């Protein structure tokens, strides 16, 4: 530790790296808590506090060095970005995708079901007449693939995606058919 404290550049680098690690843990813990992964969040919070105490101690022992304060602040902002990127890659949870289409002849519900998605659909009436409304629940890691697939089939579709708070029963109670969802390529999907 004395090697780090004796070299101002190593001190700045150490504070930056420690704060990136701390805030990454903080961001992940917050996201895990919001998504209901309480035990994983508790483990991450343990690591978070360990890293925080070390980093804060280093900064507090050398507050007279402005570069250390800047390294701490810069590490904080980068840590948020890193934490969010990790969460994007993990893609925890599910997404509900609502689709409104005027193209009945495309048989969008059947095409999506053939690809492994659970689809609930009904008819609604908008300003310009009859519309097909679809509601599709998918694991978040397949959200963009599903949206790309819908755009391939019906480029005029109106699409809204959001995260549900709770899921009970239905298609997903029987088990997610992730294997089938992974197997197709969106470039190979064609409309009828």
Swiss-Prot record:
InterPro entries: DUF2179 (IPR019264), DUF5698 (IPR044035), UPF0316 (IPR022930). The chain crosses the membrane at residues 8-28, 40-60, 66-86. It is found in: Cell membrane. Disulfide bonds: none annotated. It holds the Pfam family DUF5698. GO terms for cellular component: plasma membrane. It comes from the Bacteria. Its main location: membrane. The keyword Magnesium does not apply. This is UPF0316 protein SSP0880. It comes from Staphylococcus saprophyticus subsp. saprophyticus (strain ATCC 15305 / DSM 20229 / NCIMB 8711 / NCTC 7292 / S-41). The lineage of its organism: Bacteria, Bacillati, Bacillota, Bacilli, Bacillales.
């Amino acid at each position: 530790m004395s090697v780090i404290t004796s070299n101002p550049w190593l001190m700045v680098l150490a504070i930056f790296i420690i704060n990136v690690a701390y805030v990454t843990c903080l961001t992940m813990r917050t996201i895990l808590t919001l998504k209901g992964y309480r035990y994983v969040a508790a483990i991450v919070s343990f690591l978070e506090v360990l890293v925080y105490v070390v980093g804060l101690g280093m900064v507090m022992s050398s507050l007279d060095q402005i570069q250390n304060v800047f390294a701490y602040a810069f590490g904080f902002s980068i840590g948020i970005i890193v934490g969010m990127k990790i969460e994007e890659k993990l893609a925890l949870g599910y997404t509900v995708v609502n689709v409104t289409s005027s193209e009945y002849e495309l048989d969008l519900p059947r095409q999506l079901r053939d690809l492994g998605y659970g689809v609930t659909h009904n008819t609604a009436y908008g300003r310009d007449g009859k519309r097909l409304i679809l509601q599709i629940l998918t694991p978040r890691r397949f959200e963009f693939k599903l949206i790309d697939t819908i755009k391939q089939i019906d480029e005029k579709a109106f699409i809204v995606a959001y995260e549900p708070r709770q899921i009970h029963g239905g298609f997903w109670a029987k088990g997610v058919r992730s294997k089938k969802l992974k197997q197709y390529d969106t470039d190979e999907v064609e409309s009828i």
